[in-house]
Amino acid sequence: MSFYAPDKDAEFINDIFYTQNQAKLGDTGQSMIEYNNDLYAIIAGSRYLVRMNTAGVEKQRYAIPESEGDPRYLAADDGYIYMTQYGGQVTKLDANTLKVVGTFKGGANLEGIAECDGKLYVANSYTKNDAGYQYHTDLFVINAANMQLETTLTVDLNPNQVLEEDGKIFLISWGNYADKGYSAQMIEPQNGNKQTSLGVATNMAVGDDMVYFVNSETDYSNWPETSTNNTFFSYNIKTATVNSSSFLKNAPAELATSSVYMMSVDDEKGDIYIGVTFYSNSNGTMYRFDRNGNFVEKFDCGGQNPKTMVFID
């Protein structure tokens, strides 16, 4: 876990968790959120959820029982943390103690999660069995208070990334890697869960009443050599308009052909961050643009495969 100061009032720290705790974070940082001035991170390979202060000092951790599936993604609201898991489980934890206070069981391998108006929107992505992979079209709507399923929405195949902005849910589905490709949808909870297709995208970020998309098409057929072509576009929530033109200006040329692993938006400044991976060849690179898409800088992100970026005061 790296620390970066956009205002340049502090040095970049490659491994702030080790600096603060004199211990390694563990195997495979999967996802991280900021909530009530604390950081919560899933360390998937080491099978635990950790709570830290915004300086990276560990406060608590919750070890995932061996009988349960791998942890995946997080959402938070009203004093609780919600964690999706493979094997069909959403775990509800007290944000201050990391004590389990409720669970939802259903589905198979659960991925992205977002909270909106007391409901949890959870992607039920796929099942793996002896016959191979079975991809699903389920987006569960769960009552966050009692952790009961309210309804199941039928969405595009293999739903994965789920985000909320301005009372709307945005979803990226991964298809079946054959005749069904990646897709982006908007779901409107206040309009009967109406669904709108927004295009083809592999990743997205939300903020400032905008949704920023990328379709990062990477050819792995000559692995470990890869080739990538990126298409950037955006959706303005206020005007309900898709802009098929790139939201980036004067971007470094290499970004057009680098595999995008994550995007994030500074919720105060509106700056857009795009992280690319070079897999095991080297550390990833982070590209920073202002809210108008003007290129600001790029920097080594401090490790391979940048996955999540959160912003603190």
Regions inferred by a protein language model and the residue ranges of each:
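Predominantly soluble domains enriched in secretory-pathway, periplasmic, or organellar proteins
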Residues: 2-313
